[in-house]
Design a protein with these regions (language model features):
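Cys-dependent protein tyrosine phosphatase-like superfamily
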Residues: 1-99, 113-157
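Short cysteine clusters
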Residues: 102
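Catalytic nucleophile loop
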Residues: 108-109
């Protein structure tokens, strides 16, 4: 029987860093259909509007009954407001199966660092290692995720 992760194993940097979260790059329509059939519930897309889109993902996800959220991440949006929105979306998806993607997994890895540290209790080194496994390559994006986590760590009970 297919699992949500196995249906997406061919996307760039496919990874399942935590139960309930599958990450990677851009899926195809067929992969989204298989993800839904295997129990997928929601898609969080952090690509910028200017990026090439091989399919109308909103239309496809609506047809499939998948929740679809877009929070664009680009050079001008590496701020706390954007990270707050991403973390809210990831937290709201808990207990459901989420596909969290960008074009390659690079931005997703960075955006998950605060989730790993603040919500999962990981040490910074482990959070960064997990983010690299997800697809993080950019030092600038890593700094965005780490700095956010460090500033907000005191906000946690």
């Amino acid at each position: 029987m297919a699992t949500p992760f196995s249906t997406l194993s061919a996307i760039p940097n496919a990874c399942q860093p935590l139960p309930g979260i599958v990450t990677g790059g851009q899926p195809t329509e067929a992969q989204l259909e298989a993800f839904r059939a295997a129990g997928g519930d929601a898609v969080l897309d952090i690509r910028a509007p200017s990026e090439p889109r091989p399919l109308d993902e909103r239309t496809v996800t609506e047809r499939l009954g998948l929740d679809y959220t877009v929070i664009p991440v680009a050079a001008g949006t590496l701020d706390d407001e954007t990270m707050d929105q991403i973390l809210d979306a990831v937290r709201q998806a808990q207990g459901r199966m989420l596909l969290f993607h960008c074009a390659s997994g690079n931005r997703v890895g960075a955006a998950l660092i605060p989730h790993f540290v603040l919500d999962q209790g990981m040490e910074e080194q482990d959070a960064v290692a997990q983010a690299v496994r997800v697809g993080l390559k950019s030092p600038e994006l890593m700094a965005w995720g780490m700095e956010y986590a460090r500033r907000h760590r005191g906000d946690q009970p």
